[in-house]
């Protein structure tokens, strides 16, 4: 039983831990993951169809003094806010038209502005509670027609795609107005004001402040942009106040009074319920909204400064500026309608009933929310002009078509007449012109846009170039011209070359300026992010300190209430109530105990059944395990028998292999022995053959020597016979001469007489060649360049040990068994330098050479150095 309880407790703990983990995932991690996914989707799905932001300020624009205009400008003051130029008559008509439109707008807004109190008061807790109790729900009647809304509100600038979607929304709302009956006054009083956006109620839309509308700056460069919050006047819920507080973390940009009112409003707004968590206050959504606000502020300030500078330059062309100012005024008066600002009847029919309807006008500057881009509609855009709104009538097709023509005409003219800086890029992108020039056009007919339009279009095109990606170049960068150029083509090649060089230089300057601006912008962004992080940290610390103060106040309040409760408990009535409560509690506890006991019995019965089931399952499990063990044992025995059989086979195979190896070794040894015996026999036979050859050679030499001696002896004998015969013949001749000559006075030469030389006194000895005693002494001559030194035909026979198998055996034996040289010849001692150089004269330790080295005696340059140059003797 104890094990079953432990098991159930363990299951409960696991279930609780799992629920906590899932709750943590849903409340913390999934929020961050969803926001990261949203940011990634925005990054990868941006199509660059939205209106580009204006270019950032240059350093020269930053150094200019900012002109602060009041939130409620004086109606007698010129709203342009620029200096009176020397030629003010050119733009007087356009400025007067703008002044009249601004005065009408201010008169229409006077009533709504007076509803806002002049200054926010510091509210105590009691005053806040009293105001919550006493403030009634105000009923605000809707305006009679959408023209009143358009008159009260400032101009709303939207993009072209939002204009198309608004047109489609207007068509749908007109169709619904025809089908749906009129709404009663009671329902009208409960609906939201016309400024509330008609969007479906989603968690994302609930999290934002309801009914904020972005009122951007008008086209006149002197007006300052405002954000008007058209919400209801009843007190806000706590979550909306907290969201507004997180949105106001950015630095206010209004006047000092506005900043003071912001601080007081931060002090006044204390949450009546629990505060939002820090994750919701410092989430990516609030950071994204604050970054959007900063970007819009920057773009509005830059557009105002650029338009101011452009209006000062615009006084040069009087007629062109007159015509363009008419067109620009018409464009400025045009009201661009979003789906959020459709007529009040459509809003009241489609929007759900608001929590507490209220309507207030907040004049703090640049307070807004980012509105996402709406998808393009296939319907053509339609505009409602201010003249149509003043007539309290729906826009007729004729007026709409006129407004479209005016707008299209000025747009085409502005696109066609770009500034000179942008013209080369347009010529490169446009298709090649015709070879035949167009007919000449007088300069008076050439219409150019006003300078402020030039600078605006130039800025927009630069922004488009900055925001381009490689995939969007083919779609967005090519701007096609819809108007045929009327200026004649110049065919002067020198002028064209100069123009091309000037345009190349200008393009290079623009690229360098663009890179510099990008670097400056990156530095600005990095500094702004650092400032934003510091500001958020500071705000978080302030909020934490405020929460701590509130906690201390709540603890004090709880202590006071506890004291009052202790005092009240002393009374009799409290005691009676307590006794009654105790009786009721006892009844409830008894009832609960009975229920617990019944539940315990049921649980005990269920536990008992569960234990029985578990025991049955355990028994079946044990039986299965026993069967499995038996099967495993059989399988193991089979495996062991198989392993033994395989081992026996392996052992037999190894024995056979060993026997085969031994037999192969014995066979190999036998073959080697036979080879050695055969080699020895061959060596002996070769030695015998050599010895026999040597003996035959010696015998042959002896025979040749004997034959040579015999021939020499025979030759000498023949020579001796020939000499003897010669002498005998001479002697006979002399005897004959002597016999014939007289005997007296005859001198006889005794020296040449044959009697004296009858035999050889000392015969010449012949040198017999000595026989070699040492066969290894071949008597190799020192000069080996004689004609008999031929390796193919040596003069002397090669010994047996220097060729054949004996040489191979000797080399093999010397390789495997090298000769111990130290044992044969003894160890060689290292030489002692003292014994070699034992002279002690001091001059041997000096360098006494008188040589002068002009260059180092290297081996590379030693052979070509002259003696007189290298050494002195």
Curated annotation (Swiss-Prot):
One annotated Gene Ontology cellular component of this protein: chromosome
Primary site of residence: nucleus
Comp. bias regions, Basic residues: 60-69, 261-270
Record's keyword terms, sorted: Cell cycle, Cell division, Centromere, Chromosome, Chromosome partition, Cytoplasm, Cytoskeleton, Kinetochore, Microtubule, Mitosis, Nucleus, Phosphoprotein
Cysteines paired by S-S bonds: none
Cytoplasm keyword on record: yes
Comp. bias (Low complexity): 87-105, 314-325
Protein name: Inner centromere protein A
Gene name in the database record: incenp-a
């Amino acid at each position: 039983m104890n094990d079953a309880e432990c098991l159930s407790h363990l299951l409960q703990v696991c279930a609780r831990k799992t629920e906590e983990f899932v709750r943590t995932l849903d409340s913390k991690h999934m929020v961050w993951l969803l926001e990261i996914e949203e940011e990634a989707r925005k990054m990868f799905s941006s199509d660059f169809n939205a209106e580009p932001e204006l270019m950032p300020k240059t350093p020269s624009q930053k150094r200019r003094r900012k002109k602060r205009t009041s939130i409620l400008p004086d109606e007698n003051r010129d709203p342009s806010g620029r200096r009176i130029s020397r030629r003010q008559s050119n733009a007087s008509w356009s400025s007067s038209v703008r002044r009249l439109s601004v005065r009408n707008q201010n008169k229409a807004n006077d009533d709504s502005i007076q509803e806002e109190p002049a200054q926010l008061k510091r509210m105590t807790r009691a005053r806040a509670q009293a105001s919550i109790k006493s403030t009634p729900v105000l009923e605000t009647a809707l305006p009679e027609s959408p023209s009143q809304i358009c008159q009260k509100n400032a101009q709303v600038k939207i993009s072209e795609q939002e204009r198309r979607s608004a047109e489609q929304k207007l068509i749908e709302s007109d169709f619904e107005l025809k089908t749906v009956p009129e709404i009663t006054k009671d329902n009208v009083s409960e609906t939201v004001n016309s400024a509330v956006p008609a969007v479906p109620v989603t968690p994302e839309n609930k999290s934002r402040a309801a009914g904020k509308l972005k009122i951007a700056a008008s086209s006149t460069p002197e007006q300052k942009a405002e954000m008007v919050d058209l919400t209801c006047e009843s007190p806000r819920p706590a979550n909306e106040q907290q969201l507004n507080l997180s949105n106001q973390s950015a630095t206010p940009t209004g006047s000092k009074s506005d900043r003071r009112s912001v601080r007081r409003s931060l002090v006044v707004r204390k949450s009546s319920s629990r505060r939002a968590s820090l994750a919701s206050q410092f989430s990516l959504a609030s950071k994204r909204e604050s970054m959007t606000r900063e970007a819009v502020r920057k773009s509005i300030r830059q557009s105002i400064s650029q338009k101011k500078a452009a209006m000062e330059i615009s006084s040069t062309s009087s007629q062109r500026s007159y015509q363009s100012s008419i067109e620009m005024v018409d464009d400025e008066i045009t009201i661009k309608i979003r789906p959020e600002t459709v007529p009040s009847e459509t809003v009241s029919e489609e929007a759900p009933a608001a929590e507490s309807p209220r309507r207030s006008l907040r004049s703090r500057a640049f307070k807004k929310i980012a509105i996402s881009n709406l998808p393009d509609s296939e319907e053509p855009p339609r505009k409602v002009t201010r003249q149509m709104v003043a007539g309290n009538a729906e826009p007729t097709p004729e007026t709409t078509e006129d407004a479209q023509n005016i707008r299209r005409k000025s747009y085409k003219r502005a696109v066609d007449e770009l500034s000179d800086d942008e013209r080369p890029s347009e010529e490169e992108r446009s298709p090649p012109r015709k070879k035949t020039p167009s007919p000449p056009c007088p300069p008076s007919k050439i219409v150019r846009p006003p300078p402020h339009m030039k600078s605006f279009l130039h800025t927009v095109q630069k922004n488009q170039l900055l925001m381009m990606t490689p995939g969007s170049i083919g779609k967005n960068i090519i701007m096609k011209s819809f108007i045929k150029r009327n200026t004649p083509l110049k065919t002067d090649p020198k002028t064209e070359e100069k123009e091309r060089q000037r345009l190349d230089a200008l393009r290079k300057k623009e690229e360098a300026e663009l890179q510099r601006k990008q670097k400056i912008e990156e530095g600005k962004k990095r500094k702004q992010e650092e400032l934003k992080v510091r500001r958020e940290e500071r705000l978080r610390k302030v909020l934490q300190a405020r929460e701590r103060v509130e906690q201390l106040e709540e603890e004090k309040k709880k202590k006071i209430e506890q004291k009052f409760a202790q005092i009240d408990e002393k009374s009799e009535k409290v005691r009676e109530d307590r006794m009654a409560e105790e009786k009721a509690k006892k009844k409830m506890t008894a009832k609960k105990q009975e229920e617990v006991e019944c539940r315990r019995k049921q649980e005990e019965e269920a536990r008992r059944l569960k234990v029985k089931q578990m025991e049955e399952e355990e028994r079946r499990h044990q039986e299965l395990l026993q069967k499995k063990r038996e099967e495993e044992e059989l399988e193991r025995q089979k495996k062991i028998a198989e392993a033994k059989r395989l081992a026996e086979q392996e052992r037999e195979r190894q024995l056979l292999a060993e026997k085969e190896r031994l037999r192969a070794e014995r066979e190999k040894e036998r073959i080697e022995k036979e080879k050695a015996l055969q080699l020895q026999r061959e060596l002996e036979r070769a030695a015998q053959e050599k010895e026999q050859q040597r003996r035959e050679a010696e015998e042959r030499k002896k025979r040749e020597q004997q034959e040579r001696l015999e021939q020499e002896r025979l030759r000498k004998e023949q020579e001796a016979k020939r000499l003897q015969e010669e002498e005998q013949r001479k002697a006979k001749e002399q005897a004959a001469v002597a016999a014939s000559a007289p005997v007296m006075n005859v001198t006889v030469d005794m020296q040449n007489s044959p009697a004296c030389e009858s035999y050889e006194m000392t015969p010449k000895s012949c040198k017999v060649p000595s026989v070699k005693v040492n066969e290894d002494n071949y008597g190799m001559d020192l000069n080996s360049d004689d004609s008999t030194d031929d390796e193919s035909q040596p003069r002397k026979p090669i010994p047996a040990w220097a060729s054949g198998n004996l040489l191979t055996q000797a080399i093999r034996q010397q390789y495997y068994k090298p000769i111990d040289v130290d044992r044969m010849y003894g160890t060689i001692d290292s030489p002692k330098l003292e014994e070699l150089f034992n002279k002690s004269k001091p001059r041997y330790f000096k360098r006494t050479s008188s040589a002068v080295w002009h260059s180092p005696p290297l081996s590379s340059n030693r052979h070509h150095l002259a003696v007189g140059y290298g050494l002195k003797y």
